[in-house]
Amino acid sequence: MKFIIEREQLLKPLQQVSGPLGGRPTLPILGNLLLKVTENTLSLTGTDLEMEMMARVSLSQSHEIGATTVPARKFFDIWRGLPEGAEISVELDGDRLLVRSGRSRFSLSTLPASDFPNLDDWQSEVEFTLPQATLKRLIESTQFSMAHQDVRYYLNGMLFETENTELRTVATDGHRLAVCAMDIGQSLPGHSVIVPRKGVIELMRLLDGSGESLLQLQIGSNNLRAHVGDFIFTSKLVDGRFPDYRRVLPKNPTKTVIAGCDILKQAFSRAAILSNEKFRGVRINLTNGQLKITANNPEQEEAEEIVDVQYQGEEMEIGFNVSYLLDVLNTLKCEEVKLLLTDAVSSVQVENVASAAAAYVVMPMRL
């Protein structure tokens, strides 16, 4: 196996395929990248058995067909360390991989390509293309609500659901829920799968979200695959039942509050400074045309913020974890938000007034 290539052609692909590799691989070969030269193409693959990232790069200079695996971190560090514009030759010599460029020469250990684990073959059940920007928005709108190391393992991920012409993402950690749906202009079979947290983060790294560049998504019963430009990302799915988010959305909210997103965000941020550091609770009092936020902590310090809002109705008091509300307001980045409430013990639903694509539910707190 042999190829010659410019440093820049391989730098980004190396960075992306090294992404799935964890710090300390359980098997030595999982710390390696698979390098495979075929006719005019070099493919690079990294895997941690849960997900796999593959990049294809075209070879214009002389090359010899073959395959091997090489320590990912060291190979990438060498590549990154070589000067910009360098031409690099890579050659397999016995069980060593020789990397040469200018006056630099490296000899790396390898493991046989035949030992490299492949994700099992699988059939996709749903396939469609969509703009990268759409998928990026779907993930960005909901990923902050994913659970982290929850014993309910199915919450440590994101639900991807196809229905009619929409793709929907849902995430919840049991205290809050985020759901976002986008029309992708093609009729889809109803299907839902849970993509693990790490897979969602890797997929997000692949998306540049620029303009209308398209990607292809394939969803099977145990895997999800995304074809993005010269990259193919595959992730195993979480086997479990995701909670029915439709039951979490407040049924018939009786109170509607409309407020400026930025003004509300700043008021909550200031009040949060004097909230209990552990529980982060703030109290909200609603009266006609006004929303009052109060916070206090064990040191008996207090904060009070009053915000003008559009609200007509009976007075009401309710408590929330201020961090959860701020996460939602930071994600919405809109002009005006709508809060839908029922009573002091029911969840609040938060939406952008101008768009119903995303909805957020936050459970109340007893204060």
From Swiss-Prot:
Cytoplasm found in the keyword field: yes
For this UniProt record, the keywords arranged alphabetically read as follows:
Cytoplasm, DNA replication, DNA-binding, DNA-directed DNA polymerase, Nucleotidyltransferase, Transferase
Q: Which residues form the signal peptide?
A: none
Cellular location(s): Cytoplasm
Instruction: Write out the GO biological process terms.
Output: DNA strand elongation involved in DNA replication
Q: Which InterPro entries match?
A: DNA_clamp_sf, DNA_polIII_beta, DNA_polIII_beta_C, DNA_polIII_beta_cen, DNA_polIII_beta_N
Which GO terms label this protein's molecular function in UniProt?
3'-5' exonuclease activity; DNA binding; DNA-directed DNA polymerase activity
What Gene Ontology terms describe where this protein resides (cellular component)? cytoplasm; DNA polymerase III complex
Subunit composition and interactions? Forms a ring-shaped head-to-tail homodimer around DNA which binds and tethers DNA polymerases and other proteins to the DNA. The DNA replisome complex has a single clamp-loading complex (3 tau and 1 each of delta, delta', psi and chi subunits) which binds 3 Pol III cores (1 core on the leading strand and 2 on the lagging strand) each with a beta sliding clamp dimer. Additional proteins in the replisome are other copies of gamma, psi and chi, Ssb, DNA helicase and RNA primase.
The record's comment on protein family reads: Belongs to the beta sliding clamp family.
Protein function: Confers DNA tethering and processivity to DNA polymerases and other proteins. Acts as a clamp, forming a ring around DNA (a reaction catalyzed by the clamp-loading complex) which diffuses in an ATP-independent manner freely and bidirectionally along dsDNA. Initially characterized for its ability to contact the catalytic subunit of DNA polymerase III (Pol III), a complex, multichain enzyme responsible for most of the replicative synthesis in bacteria; Pol III exhibits 3'-5' exonuclease proofreading activity.
Q: What is this protein called?
A: Beta sliding clamp
Organism expressing this protein natively: Proteus mirabilis
Ranked from the top, the taxonomy reads:
Bacteria, Pseudomonadati, Pseudomonadota, Gammaproteobacteria, Enterobacterales
